[in-house]
C-alpha cells in the first residue's frame, strides 16, 4: 500500500496544480491513498506506514521517532531560479544541521532510492542506530518517564519561588 501525503502548498498554489494532478492520477490504483488537504495530522499515517520516502521534510524526524525507517531523497531538482542563483536556496536551508538528514538512507538518484526502499522493507532495523541517535539528540531520554520528570521539575521550580 502507498500513502501519499503532499505538503499543503500542492493544494494551495496554482503553480503546483500539475504536481497535484500527477498524484491524483495514482489514486486509480486500489492500493494508493492520497491524503486530503484537511488531513493535517500525520500521526495516523506514521503508524500505518512501514517506510517513509520523503524530501527534506520535518515529518522524517517524527517518523524516525516512532522507530521506523525513512529515506530522504537528495536528488531534488531545484527551480530554475535556484539553479541560476544557488545561494538563494542555500540561504533557505540550515546546512549546519544537514547531519540530521542522515537519520536514514539519502539516495542521490532514483535507482538508489528503489534499492534503499527494498533494503529497508526487508530489514527495518537497517538504520536503527541512526534513528536512535537522532532521537536522543533531539528529544533526549526516551524512557516513558518524561511526565514524571516534568512534574518533578515544576515542583522544584515552585519550591524555589
Label every PLM stretch briefly.
Residues 39-48:
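Short acidic alpha-helix that forms the nucleotide-activated donor recognition element
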Residues 47-60:
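Acidic donor-binding loop of glycosyltransferase active sites
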Residues 2, 53, 63, 113, ...:
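Hydrophobic, well-ordered secondary-structure elements that form the walls
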Residues 46, 64-66, 158:
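Short glycine/proline-enriched turns and hinge-like loops at secondary-structure junctions
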Amino acid at each position: 500500500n502507498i500513502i501519499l501525503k503532499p505538503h499543503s502548498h500542492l493544494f494551495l498554489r496554482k503553480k503546483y496544480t500539475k504536481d497535484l494532478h500527477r498524484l491524483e492520477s495514482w489514486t486509480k490504483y486500489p492500493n494508493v491513498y492520497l491524503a486530503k488537504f484537511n488531513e493535517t495530522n500525520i500521526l495516523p499515517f506514521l503508524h500505518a506506514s512501514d517506510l517513509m520516502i520523503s524530501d527534506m521534510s520535518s515529518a522524517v524526524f517524527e517518523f524516525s521517532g516512532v522507530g521506523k525507517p525513512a529515506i530522504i531523497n537528495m536528488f531534488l531538482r531545484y527551480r530554475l531560479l535556484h539553479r541560476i542563483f544557488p545561494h538563494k536556496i542555500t540561504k533557505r536551508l540550515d546546512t549546519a544541521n544537514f547531519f540530521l538528514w542522515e537519520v536514514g538512507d539519502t539516495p542521490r538518484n532514483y535507482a538508489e532510492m528503489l534499492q534503499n526502499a527494498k533494503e529497508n522493507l526487508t530489514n527495518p532495523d537497517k538504520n536503527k542506530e541512526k534513528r536512535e541517535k537522532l532521537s536522543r539528540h533531539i528529544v533526549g531520554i526516551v524512557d516513558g518517564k518524561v511526565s514524571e520528570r516534568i512534574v518533578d521539575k515544576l515542583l522544584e521550580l515552585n519550591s524555589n519561588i
